Swiss-Prot record:
Signal peptide: 1-17
Coiled-coil residue windows: none
Record: glycosylation sites: 144, 266
Name of protein: Inhibin alpha chain
PANTHER family named in the record: INHIBIN ALPHA CHAIN, TGF-BETA FAMILY
């Protein structure tokens, strides 16, 4: 009596051959491994421990830092800004022309620059002041032989202070003053007043002789707090937007998952042990069919005959005598395109795993 009762309790109910709790994750991973190996074959073993060899490259190319498909290596955030003197008096303007002419006779030229907010917010790596001297090469050589041709000063709260600089290569009748590293913070001020002393230079009102500053900048390095945030330990496996959407869904009743449905699982190739073989994407959402194949009714369908009970939904492609099972609809499976390497990153290969991702499930 008791053995017969036990067999009756363990026997599956009619029409629910695939019913049961959600599949164990290890079972799903084993199935995924089999599908990949069947489509791509086993990975090439070139290193110790059964994994493809690791290419010894800088950190940017190390495992876990592979470039995204269609993207270029990350470039440093650098820029160049050209600053002209703020609008004001020039040699040809009146009534300031007399004052500027007197300054020119003394060999002192005053220029006011207003660096932009973008320039002030960045780290200045180099800066050059281009100044039109009006002297040819012979005149420049004669002036340099008798003493320094150019002196550069900056106006501060303590008065004019010398700006360390050096002369570089320049076109004829021009001088290029390279500011020293200690003078670069001057370009982080809202207003920069430069005083240039050149006894042999003349003041020119021509637009093409306007002096200008060239500043090369880059993004400031992250602060200590930002570096600490960036150094936070990584998650056990890479997340994807699809995985986050799954987590953000409202909870569903357990009964919803009792019948045939499409289940999802976020799988990373690191979890599969293939992160040195399959380098992109780092993870994907694996869809599979699961659930029972009872004969539920559709409450939204109208009754065919008034007073008659609802018509049950018939399983698809049901052969007489066969038991329906929750499975993917034929012809609706999608492929997954991956990028693999067999030499640790020296070369890559694009491959396709066909019929991997389930789109629609039904009792078949």
């Amino acid at each position: 009596m008791w053995p017969q009762l036990l067999l009756l309790l363990l026997a599956p109910r009619s029409g629910h051959g695939c019913q049961g709790p959600e599949l164990d994750r290890e079972l799903v991973l084993a199935k995924v491994r089999a599908l990949f190996l069947d489509a791509l074959g086993p990975p090439a073993v070139t290193g110790e421990g059964g994994d493809p060899g690791v290419r010894r490259l800088p950190r940017r190319h190390a495992v876990g830092g592979f470039m995204r498909r269609g993207s270029e290596p990350e470039e440093e955030d650098v820029s160049q800004a050209i600053l002209f003197p703020a609008t004001g008096a020039r040699c040809g303007d009146e009534p300031a022309a007399g004052e500027l002419a007197r300054e020119a006779e003394e060999g002192l030229f005053t220029y006011v620059f207003r660096p932009s907010q973008h320039t002030r917010s960045r780290q200045v790596t180099s800066a050059q002041l281009w100044f039109h001297t009006g002297l040819d090469r012979q005149g420049m050589a004669a002036a340099n032989s008798s003493g320094p041709l150019l002196d550069l000063l900056a106006l501060s709260s303590r008065g004019p202070v010398a700006v360390p600089m050096s002369l570089g290569q320049a076109p004829p009748r021009w001088a290029v003053l390279h500011l020293a590293a200690s003078a670069l913070p001057l370009l982080t001020h809202p207003v920069l007043v430069l005083l240039l002393r050149c006894p042999l230079c003349s003041c020119s009102a021509r637009p093409e002789a306007t002096p200008f500053l060239v500043a090369h900048t880059r993004a400031r390095p992250p602060s200590g707090g930002e570096r600490a945030r960036r150094s936070t330990a990584p998650l056990p496996w890479p997340w994807s937007p699809a995985a986050l959407r799954l987590l953000q869904r409202p909870p569903e009743e357990p009964a919803v998952h009792a019948d045939c449905h499409r289940a999802s699982l976020n799988i990373s190739f690191q979890e599969l042990g293939w992160d040195r073989w399959i380098v992109h994407p780092p993870s994907f959402i694996f869809h599979y069919c699961h659930g029972g194949c009872g004969l539920p009714t559709l409450p939204n369908l109208p009754l065919s005959v008034p007073g008659a009970p609802p018509t049950p939904v018939q399983p698809l492609l049901l052969v007489p005598g066969a038991q329906p099972c929750c499975a993917a609809l034929p012809g609706t499976m999608r492929s997954l395109r991956v990028r693999t390497t067999s030499d640790g990153g020296y070369s890559f290969k694009y491959e396709t795993v066909p019929n991997l991702l389930t789109q629609h499930c039904a009792c078949i």
